[in-house]
């Protein structure tokens, strides 16, 4: 989920 954190950092990566 590390990649999701980078890609979703601008959207909902705040929770991850």
Swiss-Prot record:
GO molecular function: 3-hydroxybutyryl-CoA dehydrogenase activity
Keyword Protein transport carried by entry: no
Enzyme Commission code: 1.1.1.157
Pathway: Lipid metabolism; butanoate metabolism
Enzyme superclass (EC): oxidoreductase
Source domain of life: Bacteria
Gene Ontology biological-process annotations: butyrate metabolic process
Keywords linked to the UniProt accession: Fatty acid metabolism, Lipid metabolism, NADP, Oxidoreductase
Catalysed reactions, semicolon-separated: (3S)-3-hydroxybutanoyl-CoA + NADP(+) = acetoacetyl-CoA + NADPH + H(+)
Family: Belongs to the 3-hydroxyacyl-CoA dehydrogenase family.
Protein name stated in the entry: 3-hydroxybutyryl-CoA dehydrogenase
Species, as recorded: Clostridium pasteurianum
Lineage: Bacteria, Bacillati, Bacillota, Clostridia, Eubacteriales
Gene: hbd
């Amino acid at each position: 989920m590390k990649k999701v954190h980078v890609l979703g950092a601008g959207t909902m990566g705040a929770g991850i």
